């Protein structure tokens, strides 16, 4: 009986100690970019137009988590708001603060198209059911050079 026990134990040692064969590495060829995080995917310049509300908005999101929001409602000049943004990768929720440390009027659920050319922001504020769909578009110099810089205040709040 002891011989059987020793034999079984010896076999177990050999089986358990067997090293798995190495998996072959990737075949040579063009390198594949790793999938971008949501934060990386939304970095860039975006444009939103809402004809029913008369709003024209350009949004720039930078790698260092800063934003510039150029907003024009109706006629007149674009108003520039600046601040910082952050995104929760797990819940895909975008939030931010203006330069005066005031939080945005809402956090936003974020969705980006597979080709990275469309950004949809859905306000999480109570009662808000609209979606804001932005297209990837460079902010024109005519907008950035002729805007009115605003520090957010109670008197004039942006749509963002």
Where are these regions (language model features)?
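Lipid interaction determinants
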Residues: 18-82, 93-160
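Sec-dependent signal peptide recognition
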Residues: 2-7
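C-terminal motif of bacterial Sec signal peptides marking the signal peptidase cleavage site
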Residues: 13-16
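Residue-level detector of intrinsically disordered terminal segments
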Residues: 8-11, 43
